Amino acid sequence: MDVDYQLAFDLAPVGLVLSRNRAIVGCNQHVCEMFGAARDQLVGQSCKVLYPGAAEYERIGARLIPILNANGVYADDRIMKRVDGRFKSETFWCHVTGRTLNRDAPHEAGIWAFE
């Protein structure tokens, strides 16, 4: 059976984000629905747009570095923010799990699941 990995990424039952230096370089439809934004509104943006504020973005960014350095995987439950749509700026609880592709530079590239 041939596997279409792009289709699997796009249709995954959880939100998926590919990041590079804490910027969104790819996301699936589920993330777009969760955050109330079109893909072209998210790709190219700092992940900061998904957080309720700059302080929370910085706090979580600093907190996950030693954990990703140690084991390459990080998970938590956190408050995130809708980007656009009729619920713009509404906050919601989200379970986030991520894996870095480089433990020595954890923000360099990663994949993140949002549930």
Residue ranges and their predicted role:
Residues 1-21, 25, 29:
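Sensory modules in modular signal-transduction proteins
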Residues 19, 86-91, 95-111:
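Short loop/turn elements at sensory-signaling interfaces that couple input to output
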Residues 25-27, 33, 51, 74, 81-83, 87-92:
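PAS-family sensory domains
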Residues 31-43:
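PAS/PAS-like sensory domain cap-loop motif
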Residues 41-55:
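PAS-family sensory/regulatory domains
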Residues 54-82:
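Terminal output helix/cap of sensory domains in signal transduction proteins
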Residues 114-115:
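PAS-associated C-terminal
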